[in-house]
């Protein structure tokens, strides 16, 4: 029996460091940043969903289901994950941000292998130096635990990981895979690096 893996792209933040511009819709090399993330993960999953709390019609134009956080108030990435976990029938949910245009093409394969080999509930990606807290593969059945954590006033996702059997999947062979864009300057640097 093959496993079903769906994905959610988190585009629900306020993007304060990008001058309030919706990061997923900021153009990078002539297309919205979120399209780069879609291109990288589409071959790896069955369904893609987009979590966005504004500009929903523009995201819907990309042809994927779009939903906002169940809890209003921009409570961070956990709120988007909780909503996505309630919308999928998949065995696993891949979570990625909208501003990582170089995600590994073997992201799901390596994270799933690590989960299965260690009997874990979730895997978080690492570039070899730092964990990437919003690049993870997890079982949607963890939704109640995550919701209780958020409802208890917690926001730090790594504190939630610590409550579960979480494994780190290292991608040190792809050191640029998790470069993200938080400022206009970073966007320019990344565009120049990709163009080389």
Swiss-Prot record:
Subcellular localization(s) per the UniProt record: Cytoplasm
A Pfam short name: NTP_transf_3
Tagged with keyword Nucleotide-binding: yes
Enzyme Commission no: 2.7.7.77
Catalytic EC class: transferase
Biological processes per GO annotation: bis(molybdopterin guanine dinucleotide)molybdenum biosynthetic process
GO cellular component, one term: cytoplasm
Catalytic activity: Mo-molybdopterin + GTP + H(+) = Mo-molybdopterin guanine dinucleotide + diphosphate
Family: Belongs to the MobA family.
Subunit details: Monomer.
Function recorded in the entry: Transfers a GMP moiety from GTP to Mo-molybdopterin (Mo-MPT) cofactor (Moco or molybdenum cofactor) to form Mo-molybdopterin guanine dinucleotide (Mo-MGD) cofactor.
Protein name: Molybdenum cofactor guanylyltransferase
Organism: Shewanella woodyi (strain ATCC 51908 / MS32)
